[in-house]
From Swiss-Prot:
Residues with the N6-(pyridoxal phosphate)lysine modification: 198
Cited HAMAP family: SerC_aminotrans_5
Recorded superkingdom: Bacteria
Gene for this chain: serC
EC number in record: 2.6.1.52
Biological source species: Citrobacter koseri (strain ATCC BAA-895 / CDC 4225-83 / SGSC4696)
Protein name, entry field: Phosphoserine aminotransferase
Amino acid sequence: MAQVFNFSSGPAMLPAEVLKLAQQDLRDWHGLGTSVMEISHRGKEFIQVAEEAEQDFRDLLSIPSNYKVLFCHGGGRGQFAAIPLNILGDKTSADYVDAGYWAASAIKEAKKYCSPNVIDAKVTVDGLRAVKPMSEWQLSDNAAYVHYCPNETIDGIAIDETPNFGSDVVVAADFSSTILSAPLDVSRYGVIYAGAQKNIGPAGLTIVIVREDLLGKANIACPSILDYTVLNDNDSMFNTPPTFAWYLSGLVFKWLKAQGGVAAMNKINQQKAELLYGVIDNSDFYRNDVAKSNRSRMNVPFQLADSALDKVFLEESFAAGLHALKGHRVVGGMRASIYNAMPLEGVKALTDFMVDFERRHG
């Protein structure tokens, strides 16, 4: 079978080595005669999987000991509700930074539980979309926390700054699309959450990193499966967890360690992004409308100068083994999601195709 590179924004490409291991365990896990999908989450075998996965995740991000790691259901959208339900405490408002589609979605959900102070950080610089620096975010004095999304997958916009608002400001962030792609100072955040389906593993699992002093504040109406304290007290097994997604994510963590960890992935991700943006910037045939200071390294949207060629581009790229390049319906065009599992070889195949496509159709 010819090589295929999956540029989907999520569920996303998984490392080939991980899929091979999972294939072996799918029918007979560790010689037990049962599938890894069938073992009990209460059994010692899965408990070992869970403990190793958490420790490897902690190692990869150097997570301080005063932070809890939770393996949850519900995806990022579930956390849009969980954040205010767990962190508001006796306050009624929180700061929400709007820099794109997913930040706006979090704001919409938060309005059910509090009065968000919306900080519109979207700006235009020389005709390109950008985000105000954090120094220009007008935080309010009575906010329980400030929430933002460091990477907007649809818009291709990234906020790479590290928060430095002071120790009394609780920062909550949606790292679904950038977790484990670059070094991260966890200590600057109160809550970090990430849906697994982009840089961690398959869909169905959400990982939450929460500072332990923020536990015990959940609203009385908070569903138990979203209550950080309940989840922590039950080792993320208050109900049956998504065991297969947890197991597969654990394999990805071990794979990441074998690649050299987050620092090594950061270098590769930079190389991939520079290669792809380089082809776009050196051409009048392709364009990207995000300022270089806020370009995403994980999700690269681009448009063709002649949109009438979009259908042809997608058909020919798919035939060439370059899949899932259609842009989100909100912005159109193309989008290449190049998460950790996408090898440099895959991005090189895409850029070679783009150059050839321009030669033939430009």
